[in-house]
Amino acid sequence: ILLYALYGLRKAGRKLGVLASPSPDSFLCSRYVELFDQEANDFVYETLREGKPCMISKFGTTELNAVVTDLVTSEPLSWSVLKEFFRGELSLSRVQSILQLQKLSGFFPVSPDYGRRFCERVVNDIPEINILGSYIENEKYVLPYMHCKRINLDGYYAPFLWKNPWTKYLEGKKVLVVHPFVDSIKSQYENNRERLFDDPDVLPRFKELILVRAVQSIVGTRTDYVDWFEALKHMEDEISQLDFDIALIGCGAYGMALAA
């Protein structure tokens, strides 16, 4: 009842003009970032050159939203949480956050119990991150679990913008790519690699390209698995049989768990 009342008050406040609707990019934030752009790229490159196991990751917006919603609703609602809710910066509905997680990131089934298990998994995986691409204001809610360097997304996602791109490290390596679209990735690598970027170091020649097709379960896509956890275990088992030097993982809500 309280949850419905809070959402009703927020909706009424927006209609009356007392509360403003958040802008689409209001969740973006760079104030936790320690290294930007070229410095961030260089830090990633030097970290990889050390040759030690490391995890470079970022939060998906729906994944972090689910975790933060779970964390803030597990305790009595503070005034600061309520203020952020009324400003549209927080969700207080676990069901709604899991629905978004299913639609946009592939989690299933939509269930409070399964959602709680997912959030616990993420919280347990966060300490494994060595470098985080930081860009979301609500990362502040999981800061206590972090022990990592935080860089901006362009320094991580856009090596083609910088001198000595960190992806140069991939040259001569056995590179595993986990992604739903492995066929197009294979085709681009084999047929267009040298034409994709002006700087050849952005996408160098690997010793071997190893491909694993990730489970695709966004927007309720049917799979052969009972739940997200079974699908994750299938991919973990498949990857554990492979010999590779570095993994590039892009597969929605599965990504951080696989990397950890």
Q: Language-model segments: what does each one mean?
A:
Residues 2-205:
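Electropositive, gly/pro-rich neighborhoods at or near active sites that engage anionic ligands
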Residues 208, 214, 218-260:
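Accessory, usually C-terminal, subdomains that scaffold auxiliary metal cofactors
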